[in-house]
Amino acid sequence: SDPEAPGIWFGPRL
């Protein structure tokens, strides 16, 4: 549950 996780910001976010 890391808000800075690349899978969260650079994954589905794109």
Swiss-Prot record:
Top-rank taxon: Eukaryota
Leucine amide PTM positions: L14
Location (main, coarse): secreted
A GO MF label: neuropeptide hormone activity
Subcellular location: Secreted
Keywords on record: Amidation, Neuropeptide, Secreted
Tissue note: Expressed in the brain, subesophageal ganglion and in the retrocerebral complex (mainly corpora allata).
GO biological process, one term: neuropeptide signaling pathway
Protein source organism: Pseudoderopeltis foveolata (Cockroach)
Family to which this protein belongs: Belongs to the pyrokinin family.
Record-given protein name: Pyrokinin-6
Role: Myoactive.
GO CC, alphabetical: extracellular region
